[in-house]
Amino acid sequence: MNFYSLFVFIALIFSFNVVHGHRCHRGGNGGYGGGSGEVVVIGAEKPKDK
């Protein structure tokens, strides 16, 4: 049980790190793809809501 719990915990951190790290890296590099796409989506969603 302890090993399984530890494995799940590590997997969660790793998955979160990969997803978050990728976005931060891309956005920091100048929004090559992820950052740029996110900004465009947010900008397009705001006017649609209004």
Swiss-Prot record:
Among the record's GO biological process terms, what is one?
response to hypoxia
Range of residues in the leader sequence: 1-21
**What InterPro entries does the record point to?**
Celegans_Fungus-Induced_Rsp (IPR052889), Fungus-induced (IPR024415)
**What would be one Pfam family of this protein?**
Fungus-induced
Q: From the UniProt record, list the coiled-coil ranges.
A: none
Q: Which UniProt keywords apply?
A: Signal
Task of the protein: May have role in hypoxia response.
Q: What name does UniProt use for this protein?
A: Fungus-induced-related protein 15
- Species of origin: Caenorhabditis elegans
Q: Which gene encodes it?
A: fipr-15
